[in-house]
């Protein structure tokens, strides 16, 4: 009797499962997806050829055939799709096919969500053979008991879940491949659109505009420091005057109130003591885990999911992509037993705590919890420190969710002082309950003990403290709060939140500073154009309804191609209209806002323009015929780039108060330095609003306030300058001409090594040869004829070793790195933007194999990126 083949999607998961299955099973990993829609038109040639005979007659259909060729899916012919094995996965597929031929049975044990179901389906399609040879096994946790139960009751592939995944993939593909070229034509090259990503960007853009439109309003508060008859301190806050809420709006009103309060007699009018309680929160689902990890651990969404994935694959937690707060009966019994044994009966409620899930959540799934509550974070020796921290957070929430409420004694004191009322609130913890395992992040203002005073007691005034405040604009989204907003609006699902957050940052429409989202100007323009021409696509409710439709497909309540057809019919109508000229209702172009600034080259007026790289001044003569065209541009240095990153609770308010307001629409203006003599203030609603102002004066280019920088080449001082591409440091020695960049964080970039010519390494695309250069993202090879030839690539370690003697001393360690991985694949030098360090990675056919090595403590160490 032969062995059974078990296929999972990750090596770590395979290793864990292998511990629980006997010698009758061979467990192998597909290392994620093995095939997908093509990444280029050439890879989908077969699909295009299948329709070429029908589409060759008319030019428009020729274009359609080319589009289908690029997309790999044909929405005009029953959504016919052409899948291809992903580059670099040929060896994996070949090995799986060989093992499948020898196996008696094949178990597809990929993850239990739609993505996992789709991977299982692709595996079956590629490996082939009789469907009866395949079984689908799913489990919520990788434990011995869960694995045993799954293999005792194997099922079949759920094709409805596969179709739901395909429908999402096809819709996203169509929007990306059909709207993006329109944006290139109408607005700027290199732009992209996405069915869900564009809606997520809209959330950030709308919040940005709410902030810019917000006008901070002044208000004051008065605190009173008093003492009781026994001499105890009692701080109070003025809350009412003549039975109306006290909220003075200027210094005069405040000082008038202070004058009255200084003369008043203070006595206790009322003391209210009452018991209060605080119930524990539900066990984590994907979105709440991401939010808690952000708040308590400072983790980004991507990092949280990466750590959770590793914990799941190692068998320590249940599946991490879930929207259900449901707990299995076994899990409830396990944690209640643990609470009773370790904390006592006081901490154990009579009945298990129940938590409601969202209406469309997958009740068959569980919340995220430890597989074994007896396993403590410190015992996870095989896990990295951050994974242990996340496990502890999950463990604490799981245990806390089945504990009794925390009990408090809450007190409110009301004090009279003439026509004023003052209040103080306090709260004493009487029984810690669930907070014993999940303590609060920080104590609130009310978590204090108030002195023992009674109604009628006289108080002595020590000091009055008036304080000026300003109302705050809406808070910027963090990664976690944006996920919360997406979830609230029904946009995306647990399996897609992390990719949505990553994608909108990668596309350049938003940026993250100090863990908060800022909309880029190009993001605002693209959002406006998409809202004007693709109202349904950008509509929050429509996007949520589409998620519901995909849920219906997964639950066999809707036919997937019918859902796709309905979507595509409406979408193409909007696309056809958007393609027209603006006068006919088509998408508006990216127009400049004309200014009074003269072009230094031709004298025509300059206009405010927006590109994917930012805002700049461009000559209005650029629109003329090639013979008369003027291509002059003036770089603008954004003031938000030359200031420190906003920090503190009042930073956003203070920044808004410092900005000018547009005279046309009242929106806060963005400020840019044109040169040391001129500053340009542009309406925050530009280009929709054409308001701008030019301020003249003496402007010091901010951006570097550090110590004196010495030129590494000649020893002279370096001074701050501003050029076409922004701020930089320049050597004061005219003969030296050395420069160094100013980084976004305001620091001076480290010195770069001089280029190293390597005539022995010819370029592939020209007659040039490569030069080894040192850039902001590490070393790279570039053509010696740059910019005529822009060919670049990463250097092979074996090439660095070959020319080691020519390398500067500080780069020679890279030449000593491993030249091959254990399988003989050559290594190249790469740069980690996260650690700001260079490392080496093995590649095959231009794709990373997953093997890498890092330079640690003076030696090269094999590891994971």
Curated annotation (Swiss-Prot):
InterPro entries: TOP1_Znf, Topo_IA, Topo_IA_2, Topo_IA_AS, Topo_IA_cen, Topo_IA_cen_sub1, Topo_IA_cen_sub2, Topo_IA_cen_sub3
Region Disordered: start-end pairs: 37-65
Keywords: DNA-binding, Isomerase, Magnesium, Metal-binding, Repeat, Topoisomerase, Zinc, Zinc-finger
One GO MF term: DNA binding
Toprim domain residues: 3-142
Cofactor annotation: Mg(2+)
Gene Ontology CC terms: chromosome
Spans annotated as Interaction with DNA: 192-197
GO terms under biological process: DNA topological change
Residues annotated as the enzyme's active site: 319
Low complexity composition-biased segments: 39-54
Enzyme Commission identifier(s): 5.6.2.1
Catalysed reactions listed for this entry: ATP-independent breakage of single-stranded DNA, followed by passage and rejoining
Keyword Nucleus among UniProt keywords: no
Pfam families in alphabetical order: Topoisom_bac, Toprim, Zn_ribbon_bTOP1, Zn_ribbon_Top1, Zn_Ribbon_Topo
Function description: Releases the supercoiling and torsional tension of DNA, which is introduced during the DNA replication and transcription, by transiently cleaving and rejoining one strand of the DNA duplex. Introduces a single-strand break via transesterification at a target site in duplex DNA. The scissile phosphodiester is attacked by the catalytic tyrosine of the enzyme, resulting in the formation of a DNA-(5'-phosphotyrosyl)-enzyme intermediate and the expulsion of a 3'-OH DNA strand. The free DNA strand then undergoes passage around the unbroken strand, thus removing DNA supercoils.
Family: Belongs to the type IA topoisomerase family.
PANTHER family: DNA TOPOISOMERASE (PTHR42785:SF1), DNA TOPOISOMERASE, TYPE IA, CORE (PTHR42785)
Protein name as it appears in the record: DNA topoisomerase 1
